[in-house]
Every structure is written in C-alpha cells, then in structure tokens.
C-alpha cells in the first residue's frame, strides 16, 4: 500500500488533516515531530532546539526518514521544516537528501495556505520552537512556500476546505475509497 506524505508550513493544518485522513481511510498516522520527541527521550522540540540547535534537529529528522523508508501503508505528517537543512552559514537550504527519501517513502501532498493566514495561526504559539531567532516567520515562508510547491506530487489549498473535505480530496487523488461514507 502507498504512503501519503503531508508537507506544508507550520500552522497549515497537516496534523488535523492527517487525523481526518486516518479516520476516513483507517491508515495510521506517523508524525515526524512525535517520533523526534520519542527519539530524544521525551524532550520537547523547542527544548531540543534550544539545547542542540536547528542543525542537530534537521539531522534527527533525516535519521527518522531513513528509518521510515521501508514503511508501508502510513500517513506521514511532516514537521514544517522537513524539506530543509542548514548550510555552513546556518541558512536554510533545500535538503536534497530528505526530499529524495520522502519521494522514496510515498506520494507528497503539499497543504497550502496564504502567508498572512499562516502568520496569524502561529503567532504566540508556545508549543512550537521559536523561529524568530533565525528571521521573521513571514520571510521564512517566502523562502519555503515555493520549495513545498516544487517538492509535491499534489497540491491542495486549504483556505476554503474543512479538514474532512481536504482528506476526501487527497483520498480521491490517491484512489482510496473513504471508509467514513
């Protein structure tokens, strides 16, 4: 069975859509962020990044994707930075190695929202690591959004869709019948 991979910016709705997809298809969800917390012995991601830096976190994501490359029949809910690594200067760059693994793992679905909508959604969310130390979230989005678009096999704009409608569209695209109808 094919794996479904959800990518998109922080606050796009990947976790909500992945849960709805799972409910409709009975395919289990694996979250790269949840696996990262598990792999670090329960350390929340913001704390891990604070202690070890973003580069170490991006390495951890890569090792998680390596472990998942033979997965079969999962919905992979990816953290917002999954497509990126840091260069020598600490700038975000496309991670060819992670994108290659994601393409091996399954079909990549980009869940899209507008920049303003995303900025509003994540303002003051204490459960997420602070991105402002790198640069403003808006400028991060301006760099990341074209990369998500380029990486995806399928793009879905969530602005006017409920999570259930989004899940139905993804299942239709993949050719899996929804179990909740």
UniProtKB/Swiss-Prot annotation:
Protein name: Shikimate kinase
Record text on cofactor binding: Binds 1 Mg(2+) ion per subunit.
Gene it is expressed from: aroK
InterPro entries: P-loop_NTPase, Shikimate/glucono_kinase, Shikimate_kinase/TSH1
Native source species: Leptospira biflexa serovar Patoc (strain Patoc 1 / ATCC 23582 / Paris)
Localization of this protein: Cytoplasm
Keyword Kinase: yes
Assembly and oligomerization: Monomer.
One family name in Pfam for this protein: SKI
Domain of life: Bacteria
Catalytic activity: shikimate + ATP = 3-phosphoshikimate + ADP + H(+)
Keywords: Amino-acid biosynthesis, Aromatic amino acid biosynthesis, ATP-binding, Cytoplasm, Kinase, Magnesium, Metal-binding, Nucleotide-binding, Transferase
Sites where the protein binds ATP: 11-16, 128
Cofactor: Mg(2+)
UniProt family annotation: Belongs to the shikimate kinase family.
Segments forming a coiled coil: none
Residues annotated to bind substrate: 33, 58, 80, 144
GO biological process: amino acid biosynthetic process; aromatic amino acid family biosynthetic process; chorismate biosynthetic process
Binding site for Mg(2+): 15
Keyword presence, Transcription: no
A Gene Ontology term for the protein's cellular component: cytosol
HAMAP family: Shikimate_kinase (MF_00109)
Molecular function GO terms recorded: ATP binding; magnesium ion binding; shikimate kinase activity
